[in-house]
Amino acid sequence: AIKLVQSPNGNFAASFVLDGTKWIFKSKYYDSSKGYWVGIYEVWDRK
């Protein structure tokens, strides 16, 4: 699973927990048309 998180300054947490699911930061890109950064998170797998 993938989650996209918006940030105006490009600063993203290395990970966060939402509803008991841990998400790990993978990469980010700048959306020039909207004027903010988008961080890409993936679900952390306990395996």
Swiss-Prot record:
A Pfam match: lci
Annotated source species: Bacillus subtilis
Upper taxonomic lineage: Bacteria, Bacillati, Bacillota, Bacilli, Bacillales
Main function: Has antibacterial activity against X.oryzae pv oryzae and R.solanacearum, but not E.coli or P.carotovorum subsp carotovorum. May bind DNA or mRNA.
Signal peptide region: none
Protein name in UniProt: Antimicrobial peptide LCI
Additional remarks: Heat stable. Resistant to proteolysis by tryspin and pepsin, but susceptible to pronase E and proteinase K.
Superkingdom, taxonomy of origin: Bacteria
GO CC list: extracellular region
Record GO biological process: defense response to bacterium
Keywords for the protein's UniProt record, in alphabetical order: Antibiotic, Antimicrobial, Secreted
Cellular localisation: Secreted
